[in-house]
Amino acid sequence: MKASWRQVFAWRMQRQFLEPRTQPSASDVVGRLCGVQAQVWSVAELNVALRQAAPDRESVNREVADLSLMKTWAMRGTLHLLRPSEAGPYLSLMANTGSWLKPSWTRASGVTPRQVDELTEEVAGILDGVVLTRDELVTRLVADKRFVSMEERLRSGWGSVLKPLAWRGVLCHGPNRGNKITFTLPASQFGADWGKMPEPDEAAPTVIKAYLGAYGPATIETFDRWLSLNSTSKPKLRKWFGDMGDELTEVDVEGRKAFVLTEHAEELAATAPCTGIRLLGGFDQYLLGPGTKDEVVLAPEHRSAVSRAAGWISPVVVKDGRVVGVWEIVDQELVVTPFPDTERLPVKAVEKEAAHVARASGVSRLPVRIV
């Protein structure tokens, strides 16, 4: 089977609620996209709202409050919104990387694999049925002499020592207490809605299907980059994909061999090429799914304009499925910076998108300036 990149982009946009825009709930978006990155809360709100024909900026907060969504460390060690019932397989595959077992992790964190095991057991007991701020949790932990040496690292806002606990399903974010984050045990927070933590071999096909359902066609390497920044065992990855057999179809996309779900193959083949403009927020999953190193979606010479210092991913302009520029709001004006080799952008289409960004941002109007 063959497909063009513009067909692939159009199909992905349909699957990701970008074209056409309908009215999905926040949990619909989060489920389809295999999570929404959520280090910057306002950006997560925007990226969900931009996928709604009538943007509902409060949908994320509302669905977190009613426990339809959870916030936890997941893919690539970053904070994500996930559906509680679907989180287990993603977390299982992250735990499977065993990043805390590597000497480099021990050197960087000062915490040994055995101490991570002890922390996991202790935190599971402490958080069962309660919600604690970071300070409250750490204070309880360091009352045990085993954890005294970890106090500074445990109080760190980066949470590197706590991430393996999230992947093992014993810790997630609870409701904020003022400006303080809290943690709790997923099983006690979500009850029957908390899905089980399957073994990696059981989790893998679930996650692969979900990923390809939003970001296919994709290679094994692209999947691993999205999941774990290429930290998963390569033989395991090949086995997981190989075991799916006829559920996957190989597609030749202008010379790149990649996989799509067999159930989606005919739909992809019949998809018309992608056209039009979209303004997407920072850290948007349309780009994070294939990754900023995907040279078809984002030309390598422009990657530095999008993937910035300290892991920041800029809001992007997408034309015909490819990233062709960045944008920002400056003094209540939406400023678009096309890449130098980009053809002139259609002003009316950009202004229409800017109006949608304004609605999703809760402002009345955003005049456009293309620089």
Swiss-Prot record:
Its EC number is 3.2.2.-. Induction: The gene is adjacent to the azinomycin B biosynthetic gene cluster. It holds the Pfam family AlkZ-like. Changing E221A: No effect on base excision activity. Signal peptide: none annotated. Changing Q39A: Abrogates d7mG excision. Keywords: DNA damage, DNA repair, DNA-binding, Hydrolase. It is an enzyme of class 3 (hydrolase). A motif (QXQ) lies at residues 37-39. DNA glycosylase involved in the repair of interstrand DNA cross-links (ICLs), which are highly toxic DNA lesions that covalently tether the opposing strands of DNA, thereby inhibiting essential cellular processes such as DNA replication and transcription. Acts by unhooking both sides of the ICLs, forming abasic (AP) sites on both strands. AlkZ specifically repairs DNA damage induced by azinomycin B (AZB), a natural product with potent antibiotic and antitumor activities that interacts covalently with duplex DNA and forms ICLs. Belongs to the DNA glycosylase AlkZ-like family. This is Interstrand DNA cross-link repair glycosylase. It comes from Streptomyces sahachiroi. The gene is alkZ.
